[in-house]
A protein has these predicted regions:
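Bacterial Sec-dependent N-terminal signal peptides
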Residues: 1-9
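Extracellular/periplasmic carbohydrate-active domains that bind, remodel
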Residues: 4, 31-502
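Hydrophobic core
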Residues: 10, 14-18, 266
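Sec-dependent signal peptide cleavage junction
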Residues: 16-35
Length: 502
């Protein structure tokens, strides 16, 4: 299933591109080597194979040798906006010689603060837990000959820091015995001043249950919340922070689309729940200029059409959730109960963590041009309204789509509707976080769950950092995880995605 590749691949590649095949022993890296890779990879030197137009051919000599060269780390940096008033994030590249690298020591102001691996378990907990469970299973219970890669962690987050204070960091590789390798590399970074905080409750936002249907009363509350959150954003001073506070008694903040501006942080500590009414998400978003299907904008957006004046310096952070309200719970075409009760942890597979209460994953129905009419929530509403607004079909036909509760009812209701109309209706589904033409973006720690369409779209932007973002969208149709279309200078590390698509 895709989530296995995502959990491991994102955790590794997002640690600034560090994946080494069978190059670190179990004792050194804390992760296994496998006999499976010995068939293809020399333990000492990679035999790199290059493809050309006519097939494959072996190079005359290896492109690199992990047993030679400098033991110094390289490219130590603080990614874009990966710092605030109390924390600073670091990333780096592994040394040229890395055959004996097991971990990295990190010093703060001359004192050893810890290692990259231990820090990763705290600051990228989902990626770390699924990596640990995966490797544990396939080296003890599963097929030990399965091809796996060793993952080197090239990141560290310092927390509990003081505002408006400069810190000096040094990072150095260590071997399995803790011996330092090479010369420590140094970087300085200052935390920000303490930000002015604007709580959306102070602007009139109210907590309710998570709506999966709507009427006039619910619409009024949703529109009140949307206006309150937008008012807080509009009032936010430069460098300020708009906070969606933690919820109480399982309640959430239900909202329509909101729009961020330059020089601000949106800190989501509670749940921002997307309205089930698709009218609260303006139609007009084109994924790419050459697309013809017009979609709804996201729950949270940062966008300008003025390419010479991009949205700048935007952070989206917090311990909470952007919840898309897109699909009912289920597996494929089989609904879980009424489709509205969470099935978190009910669909485990070999290699998943055994503690499903903490680490269990939800699963959503698969979707499709016709299935959306009984499997969808917000996704159903947008498709239904598109067809209604075409004016091509009588009210009874449209109403039968809205009230379909089974595959048979949806199929019967869709009979007589053109395939093109069904396709374009389905395409109107909105996403969760959309950023376009932005410069200097940081997205960290939040959970993105159950989008109608895509999870995160960062498009036509530059200088982007994402870390410890959890995406739960499996097996909803599309449900893309972290998307960076036509963007530059992107650094991702420690993210976890369980997606039904990219």
């Amino acid at each position: 299933r895709f989530r296995k590749a995502a959990a491991l691949g994102l955790a590794a590649l997002m640690a600034v591109g560090s994946v080494n095949f069978a190059g670190v022993t179990t004792g050194a890296a804390g992760l296994p080597t496998t006999d499976g890779h010995d068939k293809y990879v020399n333990k000492n030197v990679f035999d790199v194979i290059s493809s050309d137009t006519f097939g494959t051919k072996e190079l005359e000599s290896p492109l690199f040798d992990k047993t030679k060269g400098s033991s110094d780390i390289t490219d130590l940096q603080v990614p874009t906006l990966a710092y605030d008033e109390s924390s600073i994030g670091l990333v780096w590249q592994k040394p040229e010689k890395y055959d004996n690298v097991a971990d990295y020591n990190v010093y703060i102001n001359g004192k050893l603060a810890g290692t990259a691996r231990e820090n990763y378990k705290v600051n990228a907990a989902w990626a770390a837990k699924y990596m640990e469970s995966f490797y544990d299973y396939y080296t003890t219970q599963g097929n030990s000959d399965v091809d796996m890669v060793n993952v080197d962690i090239h990141a560290y987050r310092a927390t509990g820091l003081q505002p408006d204070t400069e810190y000096t960091f040094k990072v150095v590789a260590i071997d399995k015995d803790g011996k330092e390798l090479g010369t420590p590399q140094e970087i300085k970074q200052k935390t920000t001043a303490k930000a002015e905080v604007l709580n959306i409750k102070d602007f009139g936002a109210v907590e309710t249950e998570g709506y999966t249907s709507y009427d006039d009363e619910k619409n009024a509350i949703i529109e009140k919340n949307t206006k309150a959150i937008q008012a807080a954003i509009d009032a936010c001073p430069e460098g300020g922070k708009v906070v969606i506070p933690e919820n109480t008694d399982g309640k959430v903040f239900v909202s329509g689309a909101v729009w961020l501006k330059s020089d601000m942080t949106l800190e989501v500590n509670g749940t921002l729940w997307a309205s089930p009414n698709s009218d609260h998400f303006e139609i007009g978003f084109l994924m790419y200029p050459f697309y013809t299907d017009t979609r709804g904008w996201g729950l949270v957006n940062a966008m300008t059409s003025d390419e010479s004046n991009p949205i700048k310096n935007v952070r989206v952070t917090g311990t909470g959730t952007l919840y898309g309200n897109g699909w009912k719970y289920g597996a494929g075409s089989t609904m879980y109960g009424d489709g509205l009760t969470s099935n978190k942890g009910k669909n485990t597979q070999a290699g998943d963590p055994t503690d499903t209460e903490t680490w269990g994953l939800p699963r959503y129905m698969g979707g499709g041009n016709v299935n959306v009419f009984y499997q969808g929530i917000q996704s159903k509403d947008s498709a239904y309204k598109y067809l209604k607004n075409t004016g091509k079909y009588d009210d009874a036909k449209i109403e039968s789509l809205r009230t379909a509760t089974t595959a048979a009812e949806a199929t019967a209701a869709a009979n007589g509707i053109s395939k093109d109309d069904l396709k374009f209706a389905y395409a109107t589904r909105s996403s969760l976080l959309i950023m376009r033409n932005c410069e200097n973006v940081y997205v960290g720690d939040i959970t993105i769950e159950n989008p109608s369409n895509h999870s995160v779209n960062i498009l036509d932007s530059r200088n982007i950092a994402t870390t410890n973002v959890k995406v739960f969208s499996y097996d909803g149709n599309n449900g893309d995880g972290l998307g960076y279309g036509c963007s530059q200078n992107v650094i991702c590390w420690g993210n976890f995605t369980d997606t039904g698509d990219d």
